């Protein structure tokens, strides 16, 4: 009996676990703090206060996927990105620990969401991002085409004398009345609806085509719905695009569809550059089939008038993918993206994510499977980080000491502020959470 007592090990109380000793991580080494990286930017001042108690935040400022640092490829659990780089399957396979990508914006055509899902990487967006700004910019482009303010300004800058009625008629040739014109919207999501409300105030008759939208919305907004793209093109004096880009609508506006438009119609695109065949558009502008076009997005970005099919196209207004931008919109988008990353760290992927766009492709990877309930006591709820290849148990008394994340070529990011534990109300691994899915239909522009 004495021999048994000699080798008998007293079970440690659960509340003593946190006293300088961390629970063992299952299936992998201990990772003190997950790494979250901003891939194509360098300003983390908005994101860091939201994530500083959970993760080390760093940036790459990459202009291409080849510039993403090896440390990020090997260690980053979460990534945030704008629209300036593209992640293909080959690029996604280079990430060793990545579990969630948040696109700071509404469009996600620059990420292979199917490949990401198959690799166990959730992709999220901010569907409400910059709706007001994009709608305002779209209406500005429409008004500019009708009232020709840009061309009138250029004429004065070039020294054109405008005094007599004949001179006014010559320099303002092409200006048209707005009231009574028909504006056709392709895609009637958040931005499309915001444009419709604004356009009606200027006297437009608004019609829209959106095969994904349920019936009834047209009645509440006082607009007319058409059920084929051909009908919309045939009836519209001005066509504006408000749909996401996918494999089904690439070059939606091409030589064939342009010929279905009214002679001398206008075209506006502040959605995605790939929706318009720029070669066909340039030819239509030169021939006068399209009276004028305004583009905020382009097939190849950054856009330059010095090259590409549109360099010699007349009656064309181009802006550098800035329709979405305002200080307020940028702040809101970044806060929403960081908050989504926080949900991913503290909850389950993809169940805890509010705006995951690739759930149908998502495959739960083995290292991130449901935690054995015997491994985590209920008192530690909210203090467990799901970090591959295992689980990091964090004491309720606090997180590990602050770490410094340095990405060569960027500014060192140091966390000196005291850290605190997760809120106790954070969802446990097997606790169901409510989430919203913004993919009711693809036309959320």
From Swiss-Prot:
One of its GO terms (molecular function) is transcription corepressor activity. Its main location: nucleus. The active site is at residues 272, 301, 321. Keywords: Differentiation, Methylation, NAD, Nucleus, Oxidoreductase, Phosphoprotein, Repressor, Synapse, Transcription, Transcription regulation. It holds the Pfam family 2-Hacid_dh. The modification Phosphoserine is found at residue 428. Residues 434-445 have a biased composition (Basic and acidic residues). InterPro entries: CtBP, CTBP_dehydrogenase, D-isomer_2_OHA_DH_cat_dom, D-isomer_DH_CS, D-isomer_DH_NAD-bd, NAD(P)-bd_dom_sf. CDD domains: CtBP_dh. GO terms for biological process: cellular response to leukemia inhibitory factor; negative regulation of DNA-templated transcription; positive regulation of retinoic acid receptor signaling pathway; positive regulation of transcription by RNA polymerase II; synaptic vesicle docking; white fat cell differentiation. GO terms for cellular component: cytosol; GABA-ergic synapse; glutamatergic synapse; nucleus; photoreceptor ribbon synapse; presynaptic active zone cytoplasmic component; presynaptic cytosol; ribbon synapse. SUPFAM superfamilies: Formate/glycerate dehydrogenase catalytic domain-like, NAD(P)-binding Rossmann-fold domains. The modification Asymmetric dimethylarginine is found at residue 22. Found in all tissues except spleen and liver. Residues 414-445 are annotated as: Disordered. NAD(+) binds at residues 106, 186-191, 210, 243-249, 270-272, 296, 321-324. It is found in: Nucleus; Synapse. Phosphorylation by HIPK2 on Ser-428 induces proteasomal degradation. PANTHER family: C-TERMINAL-BINDING PROTEIN (PTHR46029), C-TERMINAL-BINDING PROTEIN 2 (PTHR46029:SF3). Interacts with HIPK2 and PNN. Interacts with the transcription factors ZNF217, BKLF, delta EF1/AREB6/ZEB, EVI-1 and Friend of GATA (FOG) via the consensus motif P-X-[DNS]-L-[STVA]. Also interacts with the C-terminus of adenovirus E1A protein. Can form a complex with BKLF on a CACCC-box oligonucleotide. Can form homodimers or heterodimers of CTBP1 and CTBP2. Interacts with NRIP1 and WIZ. Interacts with PRDM16; represses white adipose tissue (WAT)-specific genes expression. Interacts with MCRIP1. Belongs to the D-isomer specific 2-hydroxyacid dehydrogenase family. Corepressor targeting diverse transcription regulators. Isoform 2 probably acts as a scaffold for specialized synapses. Functions in brown adipose tissue (BAT) differentiation. This is C-terminal-binding protein 2. The lineage of its organism: Eukaryota, Metazoa, Chordata, Craniata, Vertebrata.
């Amino acid at each position: 009996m004495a021999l048994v007592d000699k080798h008998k090990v007293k079970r440690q109380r659960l509340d003593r676990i946190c006293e300088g000793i961390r629970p063992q991580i299952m299936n992998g080494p201990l990772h003190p703090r997950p790494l979250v990286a901003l891939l194509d930017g360098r300003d983390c001042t908005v994101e860091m206060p939201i994530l500083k108690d959970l993760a080390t935040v760093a940036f790459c400022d990459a202009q291409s996927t080849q510039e993403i640092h090896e440390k990020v490829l090997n260690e980053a659990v979460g990534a945030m990105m704008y629209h300036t780089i593209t992640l293909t399957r080959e690029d996604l396979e280079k990430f060793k620990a990545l579990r969630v990508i948040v696109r700071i914006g509404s469009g996600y055509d620059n990420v292979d969401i199917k490949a990401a899902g198959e690799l166990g990487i959730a992709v999220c967006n901010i569907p409400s991002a910059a709706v007001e700004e994009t709608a305002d910019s779209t209406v500005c482009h429409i008004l500019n085409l009708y009232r020709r303010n840009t061309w009138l300004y250029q004429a004065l800058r070039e020294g054109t004398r405008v005094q007599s009625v004949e001179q006014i008629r010559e320099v303002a040739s092409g200006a048209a009345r707005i009231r009574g014109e028909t504006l056709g919207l392709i895609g009637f999501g958040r931005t499309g609806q915001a444009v419709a409300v604004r356009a009606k105030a200027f006297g437009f008759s608004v019609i829209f085509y959106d095969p994904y939208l349920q019936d009834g919305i047209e009645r509440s907004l006082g607009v007319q719905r058409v059920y084929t793209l051909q009908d919309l093109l045939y009836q519209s004096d001005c066509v504006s695009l408000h749909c996401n880009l996918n494999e089904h609508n690439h070059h939606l506006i091409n030589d064939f569809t342009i010929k279905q438009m009214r002679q001398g119609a206008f075209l506006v695109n502040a959605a995605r550059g790939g929706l318009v065949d720029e070669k066909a558009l340039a030819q239509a502008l030169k021939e006068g089939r399209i009276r004028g076009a305004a583009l905020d997005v382009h097939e190849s970005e950054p856009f330059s008038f010095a090259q590409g099919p549109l360099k010699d196209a007349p009656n064309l207004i181009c802006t550098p993918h800035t329709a979405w931008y305002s200080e307020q919109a940028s702040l809101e988008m970044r806060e929403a993206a960081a908050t989504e990353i926080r949900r991913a760290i503290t909850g389950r992927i993809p169940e805890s994510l509010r705006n995951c766009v690739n759930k149908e492709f998502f495959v739960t990877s083995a290292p991130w499977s449901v935690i054995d309930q015997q491994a985590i006591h209920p008192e530690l709820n909210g203090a467990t980080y799901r970090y591959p290849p295992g689980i990091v148990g964090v004491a309720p008394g606090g997180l590990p000491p602050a770490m410094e994340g340095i990405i060569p070529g960027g500014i060192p990011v140091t966390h000196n502020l005291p850290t605190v534990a997760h809120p106790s109300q954070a969802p446990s691994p097997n606790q169901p959470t409510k989430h919203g899915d913004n993919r009711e239909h693809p036309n959320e522009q």
